[in-house]
Design a protein with these regions (language model features):
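An N-cap/entry alpha-helix motif that binds or orients negatively charged groups
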Residues: 1-82, 363-386
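Conserved active-site-proximal phosphate/metal-binding subdomains
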Residues: 3-10, 15, 28-31, 229, ...
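Active-site cofactor/substrate anionic-group-binding motifs, chiefly glycine-
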Residues: 76-123
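Secondary-structure boundary/capping motif
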Residues: 97-98, 125-129, 217, 323
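Short, solvent-exposed loop/turn segments at secondary-structure boundaries
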Residues: 99-100, 128, 183-186, 326-327
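"Short basic amphipathic alpha-helical interaction patches in structured regions
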Residues: 100-107, 130-133, 162-163
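Alpha/beta enzyme core
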Residues: 106-111, 139-147, 152-293, 299-319
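A gly/proline- and charged-residue-enriched helix-loop-helix capping module
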Residues: 112-150
Length: 386
């Protein structure tokens, strides 16, 4: 079923008195449909059609100097060791359908040793009947590193409940003003968000991660977050799941189509944060940890993000598509394959650890280089830093 027919079906149900389509289900369906449209557009543009990460390249050296078996793919996130430097990022929950998706994602995470974040648990905090669609995550991944997810509209008490709901190891707070403003029923007042984030940081017993939802973060945003004591920031850049497009498809006139390209890519964000004096230090004096996500579709994209300073990389749309298109076993195989390919790519670059990967030469070209130069990034130094 095409997106237009999906949308017409939603409208018809609403007008006929039929049970309304759950917004979370609608988001999943629209995200999958838009993913298909992007893939078709890229295919039509030819094999050379660039993705948002294609501007980031490496200098090949013929003698890596290390053995593949000696490569350590582990990383530390929020003070905890992760076996691999990528994770299943926040997606969904809040309906019967998305509860099943969450259960499968969690089972796959548990089977492969990959960390996972839930989608926003805010619906379950408002309606306890939806709590089971999130509890299945911990039930299916009892030993995994799990992040719960809320909006900055939630109170400190609700934030604590979100952590308790899945016995979370960390709490993501998603910030999504662009999505909210295009969403027909979205929030319109963001004046209290930063103060609320600070209150939540003080009020919960787990590390807090602030995450964009596909539009990127600026150094000013990171400075404001750092001042509130947040442990990590997921830059979540443009180019992957696009919630402006998703919410615009839910509008009768679809009048915000011109905002489809809003925001910065993850690569642009990570480069922007490398400018000398970028505010990466929390009030405690410890650095804010950078995580990356947004249009990550291959293990090479993971390596690119790590080389630009991310400690770990979140993947949502790609893993969801594998699960919905090819099934659970295919997702488990994909997670295993990514782990092995990350190790292979680190070997090729002569980096035996993630820390060493962040010292290799990186070449930045195209529109990403133009953005970086305008923002004052020394790209020549980045290309010769080894």
């Amino acid at each position: 079923m095409s997106i237009e027919r999906d949308r017409a079906h939603v409208a018809a149900q609403a007008g006929s008195g039929a049970a309304p389509v759950n917004r979370k289900d609608e988001h999943v369906d629209l995200a999958q449909g838009l993913r298909g449209e992007r893939a078709a557009a890229a295919s039509g543009a030819g094999a050379g059609h660039p993705g948002v990460w294609e501007d980031v390249r490496f200098v090949h050296h013929s003698f890596p100097g290390i053995a593949r078996d000696a490569v350590d793919t582990s990383t530390v996130v929020c003070g905890r060791d992760w076996a691999v430097p990528f994770h299943i990022n926040a997606m969904t929950g809040g309906s019967e359908k998305t509860g099943r998706i969450n259960a499968d994602l969690a089972r796959a995470a548990a089977q492969t040793g990959v960390a996972m974040a839930t989608g926003s648990v805010s619906p379950a905090l408002r309606d306890p009947e939806l709590a089971g669609t999130f509890r299945v995550v911990r039930e299916n991944a009892p030993e995994a590193f799990l992040m719960s997810n809320i909006s900055p509209e939630m109170t400190v008490e609700q934030a604590g409940a979100a952590v308790e709901l899945i016995d979370a190891d960390a709490l993501q707070i998603h910030v999504n003003p662009a999505q909210e403003l295009v969403m027909p029923e979205g929030d319109r007042d963001f004046s209290h968000w930063l103060d609320r984030i600070g209150e939540i940081v003080e009020g919960v017993d787990v590390p807090v991660v602030v995450k964009e939802v596909g539009f990127g973060v600026s150094p000013r945003t990171v400075a404001e977050i750092a001042a509130r004591g947040v442990v990590a920031v997921d830059v979540s850049g443009r180019g992957g799941t696009n919630f402006i497009d998703i919410e615009n498809r839910r509008r009768e006139k679809q009048e915000y189509a011109y905002l489809s390209g809003w925001g910065q890519t993850a690569a642009e964000c990570l480069l922007d944060l490398q400018v000398e004096g970028a505010p990466l230090v929390r009030t405690s004096g410890s650095p804010v940890q950078m995580l990356a996500s947004g249009a990550v579709s291959t293990p090479l994209d993971v390596i690119r993000a790590l080389a630009l300073g991310a400690s770990a990389v979140g993947v949502s749309g790609h893993f969801l598509n594998v699960l919905l298109t090819d099934g659970y076993d295919a997702l488990v195989e994909e997670l295993h394959d990514w782990t092995e390919q990350v190790r292979t790519l680190m070997t090729l670059l002569g980096a035996s650890t993630v820390a060493e990967l962040q010292k290799v030469d990186v070449l930045v070209t195209g529109s990403t280089a133009e953005f970086a130069r305008l923002r004052g990034v020394d790209l020549a130094a980045l290309a010769r830093r080894s």
